[in-house]
Amino acid sequence: INGYYTLSMEKIAKLNHLVGGVEVTIQDDFSKVDDTMKLGSTIVLTDEQAYTYVHDRYNVGDEANLSRMARQREYMKSLFTKVQQKTKEKSGYINTIYKGLKQDATTDMKGKTISKLTNRISKGTYLGMHTLEGQVSTGKALGDGIDHVEYRVNDQEKISVLTEIYGLQEGKEKDE
């Protein structure tokens, strides 16, 4: 890893605002949290709804983290598509987002490096995200004495996904 750029979950609303909202199809029942977010409807999320959509787990659908992660993937895919579209319309658009989040992000990269990286990303193709297979169980791994739903990834699945991503073969590097 040559650098990192992080944005806390609490800043999703601000990111959403900077891009003018992100369109998603509501995947879970949000009726206990926000009755305007109706299951199956396609909406452009308000800033507060964007945070709710990617953050909330309890009182939403089956309350499973896997469901929340699916919503996060959908949000990221739609965000990527929107940013890519807006960047094609206005080449400096990505810099507007960067400047808007500068005080909220944590990074070890300089502006020039981020600019090069975002330029490459904006011209790229969204290849999706991997969900690793595993088992859902209930446990007390957080140490708070409360049963929580936990997800444990199969070791073989970890190897399989890393092999797919990096083109690894036993005993060989990708370019050998």
Labelled PLM ranges:
Residues 2-3, 49-51, 124, 149:
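Intrinsically disordered, low-complexity segments enriched in small/polar residues
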Residues 45, 106-176:
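C-terminal solvent-exposed extensions
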Residues 33-37, 75, 96-100, 115-118, ...:
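Short, surface-exposed, charged/polar-biased interaction segments
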Residues 1-2, 7-22, 27, 57, ...:
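Structured segments of extracytoplasmic/periplasmic soluble domains
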Residues 1-3, 38-40, 58-67, 80-88, ...:
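Second-shell loop/turn segments in exported
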Residues 8-15, 50, 71-75, 79, ...:
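Stable alpha-helical elements in mature extracytoplasmic
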Residues 2-6, 52-53, 128-131:
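Structural recognition of the beta-strand scaffold that forms the well-ordered cores
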Residues 11-94, 173:
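Flexible, polar/acidic helix-loop-strand segments at domain edges
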